[in-house]
Amino acid sequence: MKISILTLFPEMFSIFDHSIIGRARENNIVDLETLNIRDYTLNKHKKVDDYPYGGGAGMVMAPQPIVDTIRDAKLSNKGKVVFLGPRGKTFNQEIAKELSKEEGLIFLCGHYEGIDERVYKHIDMEISLGDFVLTGGEMAAIPVIDCILRLIPGVLGKEESFMEESFYNGLLEYPQYTRPEEFEGDKVPEILLSGHHENIRKWRRLKSLEVTKKIRPDLYKKITLTKEDIKILKNKNNK
Protein backbone atom coordinates (compact mmCIF):
# COMPACT_ATOMS: atom_id res chain seq x y z
CA MET A 1 0.00 0.00 0.00
CA LYS A 2 1.13 3.54 -0.72
CA ILE A 3 0.38 6.22 1.88
CA SER A 4 0.80 9.90 1.03
CA ILE A 5 0.53 12.37 3.91
CA LEU A 6 -0.12 16.02 3.09
CA THR A 7 0.95 18.15 6.02
CA LEU A 8 2.61 21.35 7.23
CA PHE A 9 4.68 19.32 9.69
CA PRO A 10 6.23 16.29 7.93
CA GLU A 11 8.72 15.77 10.76
CA MET A 12 5.87 14.65 13.03
CA PHE A 13 5.58 11.44 11.00
CA SER A 14 9.14 10.31 11.70
CA ILE A 15 7.50 7.93 14.19
CA PHE A 16 6.79 5.70 11.18
CA ASP A 17 10.55 5.24 10.69
CA HIS A 18 10.60 2.96 13.71
CA SER A 19 9.24 -0.31 15.08
CA ILE A 20 6.70 -2.39 13.12
CA ILE A 21 5.83 0.22 10.49
CA GLY A 22 9.50 1.08 10.01
CA ARG A 23 10.31 -2.58 9.29
CA ALA A 24 7.36 -2.83 6.91
CA ARG A 25 8.74 0.14 4.98
CA GLU A 26 12.22 -1.38 4.88
CA ASN A 27 10.71 -4.59 3.49
CA ASN A 28 8.74 -2.64 0.85
CA ILE A 29 5.40 -3.79 2.22
CA VAL A 30 4.40 -0.19 2.82
CA ASP A 31 5.39 2.88 0.81
CA LEU A 32 4.92 6.02 2.92
CA GLU A 33 5.71 9.57 1.86
CA THR A 34 5.08 13.04 3.28
CA LEU A 35 4.40 16.10 1.15
CA ASN A 36 4.86 19.52 2.75
CA ILE A 37 1.90 21.70 1.79
CA ARG A 38 4.04 24.81 2.30
CA ASP A 39 6.26 23.73 -0.62
CA TYR A 40 3.30 24.18 -2.99
CA THR A 41 2.17 27.68 -2.07
CA LEU A 42 2.50 30.39 -4.71
CA ASN A 43 2.67 33.06 -2.02
CA LYS A 44 6.09 34.72 -2.08
CA HIS A 45 6.18 34.68 1.73
CA LYS A 46 5.34 30.95 1.81
CA LYS A 47 2.05 31.65 3.56
CA VAL A 48 -0.50 28.83 3.49
CA ASP A 49 -3.25 30.51 5.54
CA ASP A 50 -5.19 33.77 5.70
CA TYR A 51 -7.88 35.59 7.65
CA PRO A 52 -11.43 34.23 7.26
CA TYR A 53 -13.88 36.21 5.12
CA GLY A 54 -16.62 37.63 7.34
CA GLY A 55 -14.29 37.90 10.30
CA GLY A 56 -13.74 35.55 13.19
CA ALA A 57 -10.94 34.11 15.24
CA GLY A 58 -7.97 32.26 13.85
CA MET A 59 -6.66 31.60 10.36
CA VAL A 60 -7.95 29.37 7.56
CA MET A 61 -5.77 27.20 5.32
CA ALA A 62 -5.93 28.57 1.77
CA PRO A 63 -7.18 26.35 -1.07
CA GLN A 64 -4.38 26.79 -3.62
CA PRO A 65 -1.49 25.07 -1.80
CA ILE A 66 -3.72 22.25 -0.56
CA VAL A 67 -5.27 21.49 -3.95
CA ASP A 68 -1.91 21.65 -5.72
CA THR A 69 -0.43 19.24 -3.15
CA ILE A 70 -3.35 16.83 -3.68
CA ARG A 71 -2.85 16.97 -7.45
CA ASP A 72 0.86 16.25 -7.12
CA ALA A 73 0.20 13.32 -4.77
CA LYS A 74 -2.29 11.86 -7.25
CA LEU A 75 0.38 11.62 -9.93
CA SER A 76 1.81 8.58 -8.12
CA ASN A 77 -1.02 7.63 -5.76
CA LYS A 78 -4.52 6.99 -7.14
CA GLY A 79 -6.01 6.35 -3.71
CA LYS A 80 -8.84 8.13 -1.94
CA VAL A 81 -8.17 11.53 -0.39
CA VAL A 82 -8.95 11.24 3.33
CA PHE A 83 -9.29 14.39 5.43
CA LEU A 84 -8.94 14.32 9.21
CA GLY A 85 -11.69 16.64 10.39
CA PRO A 86 -14.66 17.10 12.76
CA ARG A 87 -17.39 16.46 10.15
CA GLY A 88 -16.26 12.94 9.40
CA LYS A 89 -17.36 9.50 10.49
CA THR A 90 -15.91 8.45 13.81
CA PHE A 91 -13.00 6.14 13.06
CA ASN A 92 -13.22 2.52 14.22
CA GLN A 93 -11.83 -0.91 13.39
CA GLU A 94 -14.44 -1.57 10.69
CA ILE A 95 -13.41 1.57 8.79
CA ALA A 96 -9.77 0.54 9.22
CA LYS A 97 -10.52 -2.88 7.68
CA GLU A 98 -12.18 -1.31 4.65
CA LEU A 99 -9.39 1.22 4.08
CA SER A 100 -6.71 -1.47 4.47
CA LYS A 101 -8.04 -3.06 1.26
CA GLU A 102 -7.14 0.04 -0.80
CA GLU A 103 -3.99 0.10 -2.93
CA GLY A 104 -3.24 3.62 -1.77
CA LEU A 105 -4.52 6.43 0.44
CA ILE A 106 -3.83 10.17 0.57
CA PHE A 107 -4.23 11.77 4.00
CA LEU A 108 -4.80 15.51 4.28
CA CYS A 109 -3.96 17.05 7.65
CA GLY A 110 -5.61 20.36 8.43
CA HIS A 111 -4.38 23.02 10.84
CA TYR A 112 -5.34 26.39 12.28
CA GLU A 113 -9.12 26.98 12.17
CA GLY A 114 -9.61 24.52 9.32
CA ILE A 115 -9.50 24.44 5.54
CA ASP A 116 -11.20 26.60 2.91
CA GLU A 117 -14.59 25.08 2.05
CA ARG A 118 -13.66 24.89 -1.63
CA VAL A 119 -11.10 22.18 -0.88
CA TYR A 120 -13.86 19.71 0.06
CA LYS A 121 -14.68 18.95 -3.59
CA HIS A 122 -11.25 17.31 -3.78
CA ILE A 123 -11.83 15.13 -0.70
CA ASP A 124 -13.31 11.62 -0.94
CA MET A 125 -13.73 10.83 2.75
CA GLU A 126 -13.57 12.62 6.09
CA ILE A 127 -12.62 10.88 9.33
CA SER A 128 -12.89 12.07 12.93
CA LEU A 129 -11.40 10.53 16.06
CA GLY A 130 -14.26 11.78 18.19
CA ASP A 131 -15.98 14.80 19.68
CA PHE A 132 -12.92 16.65 20.91
CA VAL A 133 -10.46 19.18 19.50
CA LEU A 134 -6.82 18.56 18.57
CA THR A 135 -4.17 21.08 17.58
CA GLY A 136 -3.89 19.66 14.08
CA GLY A 137 -4.81 16.80 11.79
CA GLU A 138 -1.38 15.26 12.18
CA MET A 139 -2.20 14.05 15.68
CA ALA A 140 -5.30 12.30 14.35
CA ALA A 141 -3.60 10.93 11.24
CA ILE A 142 -0.90 9.03 13.15
CA PRO A 143 -3.20 6.57 14.99
CA VAL A 144 -5.48 6.22 11.94
CA ILE A 145 -2.59 5.34 9.62
CA ASP A 146 -1.01 3.02 12.19
CA CYS A 147 -4.30 1.16 12.70
CA ILE A 148 -4.78 0.69 8.94
CA LEU A 149 -1.22 -0.42 8.21
CA ARG A 150 -1.29 -3.07 10.95
CA LEU A 151 -3.96 -4.84 8.89
CA ILE A 152 -1.83 -5.04 5.73
CA PRO A 153 -0.65 -8.65 5.16
CA GLY A 154 2.98 -9.02 6.19
CA VAL A 155 3.19 -5.92 8.39
CA LEU A 156 2.76 -7.84 11.66
CA GLY A 157 4.27 -11.05 10.36
CA LYS A 158 1.37 -13.31 11.35
CA GLU A 159 -2.28 -12.67 10.53
CA GLU A 160 -3.23 -14.03 13.95
CA SER A 161 -1.41 -11.09 15.54
CA PHE A 162 -4.13 -8.64 14.57
CA MET A 163 -7.04 -11.09 14.34
CA GLU A 164 -6.86 -11.65 18.09
CA GLU A 165 -6.44 -7.99 19.02
CA SER A 166 -9.16 -5.92 20.65
CA PHE A 167 -11.97 -4.79 18.33
CA TYR A 168 -10.87 -6.87 15.30
CA ASN A 169 -13.60 -9.46 15.91
CA GLY A 170 -15.91 -7.11 17.79
CA LEU A 171 -14.58 -8.06 21.22
CA LEU A 172 -11.93 -6.78 23.60
CA GLU A 173 -8.79 -8.90 23.81
CA TYR A 174 -8.33 -11.58 26.45
CA PRO A 175 -5.87 -11.00 29.37
CA GLN A 176 -2.18 -11.46 28.57
CA TYR A 177 0.60 -12.76 30.86
CA THR A 178 4.36 -13.20 30.66
CA ARG A 179 7.16 -14.24 33.05
CA PRO A 180 7.43 -14.54 36.01
CA GLU A 181 4.74 -17.12 36.80
CA GLU A 182 4.06 -15.35 40.09
CA PHE A 183 4.34 -11.62 40.78
CA GLU A 184 3.56 -10.13 44.21
CA GLY A 185 1.27 -13.05 44.98
CA ASP A 186 -0.57 -12.99 41.65
CA LYS A 187 -0.15 -16.19 39.66
CA VAL A 188 -0.55 -16.83 35.95
CA PRO A 189 -3.71 -18.93 35.33
CA GLU A 190 -2.71 -22.60 35.32
CA ILE A 191 -4.42 -23.29 32.00
CA LEU A 192 -1.91 -21.02 30.23
CA LEU A 193 0.91 -23.19 31.57
CA SER A 194 -0.75 -26.46 30.56
CA GLY A 195 0.42 -26.56 26.95
CA HIS A 196 -3.09 -27.70 25.90
CA HIS A 197 -3.67 -25.39 22.94
CA GLU A 198 -7.37 -26.13 22.45
CA ASN A 199 -8.19 -25.50 26.11
CA ILE A 200 -6.13 -22.31 26.03
CA ARG A 201 -8.02 -21.13 22.93
CA LYS A 202 -11.37 -21.73 24.62
CA TRP A 203 -10.21 -20.00 27.82
CA ARG A 204 -9.09 -16.97 25.84
CA ARG A 205 -12.41 -16.81 24.02
CA LEU A 206 -14.28 -17.02 27.33
CA LYS A 207 -12.19 -14.26 28.88
CA SER A 208 -12.61 -12.08 25.80
CA LEU A 209 -16.39 -12.44 26.10
CA GLU A 210 -16.31 -11.76 29.85
CA VAL A 211 -14.06 -8.70 29.59
CA THR A 212 -16.15 -7.20 26.80
CA LYS A 213 -19.42 -7.76 28.66
CA LYS A 214 -18.02 -6.16 31.81
CA ILE A 215 -16.12 -3.19 30.35
CA ARG A 216 -17.89 -2.52 27.04
CA PRO A 217 -21.48 -3.81 27.32
CA ASP A 218 -22.33 -1.69 24.28
CA LEU A 219 -19.98 -3.81 22.15
CA TYR A 220 -21.18 -7.05 23.72
CA LYS A 221 -24.77 -6.31 22.73
CA LYS A 222 -23.74 -6.04 19.09
CA ILE A 223 -22.03 -9.42 18.76
CA THR A 224 -23.72 -12.63 17.65
CA LEU A 225 -22.70 -15.51 19.89
CA THR A 226 -21.61 -18.64 18.03
CA LYS A 227 -22.71 -22.12 19.08
CA GLU A 228 -19.25 -22.59 20.57
CA ASP A 229 -19.55 -19.31 22.51
CA ILE A 230 -22.84 -20.45 24.03
CA LYS A 231 -21.29 -23.80 24.96
CA ILE A 232 -18.21 -22.15 26.50
CA LEU A 233 -20.35 -19.79 28.58
CA LYS A 234 -22.65 -22.63 29.65
CA ASN A 235 -19.72 -24.80 30.76
CA LYS A 236 -18.31 -21.89 32.74
CA ASN A 237 -21.62 -21.31 34.52
CA ASN A 238 -21.94 -25.01 35.38
CA LYS A 239 -18.60 -25.08 37.18
Curated annotation (Swiss-Prot):
Homodimer. The keyword Methyltransferase applies. Belongs to the RNA methyltransferase TrmD family. Its EC number is 2.1.1.228. S-adenosyl-L-methionine binds at G110, L129, G130, D131, F132, V133, L134. This is tRNA (guanine-N(1)-)-methyltransferase. One of its GO terms (cellular component) is cytosol. It is found in: Cytoplasm. One of its GO terms (biological process) is tRNA N1-guanine methylation. Its main location: cytoplasm. InterPro entries: Alpha/beta_knot_MTases (IPR029028), tRNA_m1G_MeTrfase_C_sf (IPR023148), tRNA_m1G_MeTrfase_TrmD (IPR002649), tRNA_m1G_MTases_N (IPR029026), tRNA_MeTrfase_TRMD/TRM10 (IPR016009). Specifically methylates guanosine-37 in various tRNAs. One of its GO terms (molecular function) is tRNA (guanine(37)-N1)-methyltransferase activity. It comes from Clostridium beijerinckii (strain ATCC 51743 / NCIMB 8052). HAMAP family: TrmD. The keyword Transmembrane helix does not apply. Keywords: Cytoplasm, Methyltransferase, S-adenosyl-L-methionine, Transferase, tRNA processing. It catalyses: guanosine(37) in tRNA + S-adenosyl-L-methionine = N(1)-methylguanosine(37) in tRNA + S-adenosyl-L-homocysteine + H(+).
